[in-house]
Amino acid sequence: MDKKNVMRIETEDKHDISQQKHASLNVQSGRKEEAPSHRQLAGPPAIIIFISLLVACTLLSFTLGRYPVALKELLAILGNKIFGLFKNSEKFWTDQMEAAVWNVRLPRVILSVLVGACLSAAGASYQGVFQNPMASPDILGASAGAGFGAALAIFLDFKHVNITLCAFAMSLLTVALVFRISRYVKGGKVLGLVLAGIMVSSLFNAGTSFLKLVADPNNKLPQITYWLMGSLAGAKWSDIRFVVFPMLAGLIPLLLLRWRLNVITMGDEEAKAMGVDAGRIRIAVIISATLVTASAVSVSGVIGWVGLVIPHMMRRIVGSSYRWLMPVSMLGGGIFLLMVDNISRNVTTAGIPIGILTAFVGAPFFLLLITGRGERY
């Protein structure tokens, strides 16, 4: 067994010991520690199940819509476009059907999965780094910055691609400003980041409100409002090409650092005893989570609750170890947002903004947590 595997095993063992200590402290302090009322799945079976669900939901998403597409026709169109099949044979599908699948539904499905995976991964990462179960992807102001950038671009009458670019750039600049301000905040580094994030978010939200106030009420204001509610209705291949590399650049480090996240959740002293530089790992995780959040929000608008709700749901399924929690959260987030988007585009002709639908799910779950009837993490 090599050194890397030994390190991973020690991390998992230490994480279990830390959870036992936490339970013991709860008993000593008089708090009642109840055993989980459900049975958790092992990591590998859970991943297999969620991958299967993702494939099934993806195929289902292609067949749903005002222009019906059968599974046989769907597979034929994808095979023809991707692998060049059926080129020498007569098509049994129409050009309109091919355009609907390839130019409209496929970009939207891919973007739904990517955005859901990114928001869930970012939420799980922030909850571990800040050791706060209520942490979400917008804790450092990434969403507020992206909203201001998009509103400014719409106000200045920029094109679709430039709106996405402005939202992405402003999101990263906002978090950079939060890091800068946090250096001057008295207290710990984590507390400084959270307080600076609250202040900067409030500042950029005020800027967005001002732009809405002075925007043209007949043209610009509805466009800004709709963007801020979150939607994937205008998903294009250019959006995917723009965000796929930043998303991968953030998701891959989060997957590679998920064992170290277990160490960070034990506290800095435990991490130092195990030879882990908690400060550097924390910064690396925050930067990666911010990158995927900025990428997701820049193409989808502000979609709340996904990064808060999905990690908690996945903890009930696979436990709190980031070895399995991180990949399962990514899969669960992709499935969740994909199904919500299916509802969004099929309930009404115009489509319901995704942010509204995710709030209908997230708000009751949040209520369950704060009333103490849900499982505490």
Q: What does each model-found stretch correspond to?
A:
Residues D2-Y377:
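Alpha-helical transmembrane segments in inner-membrane proteins
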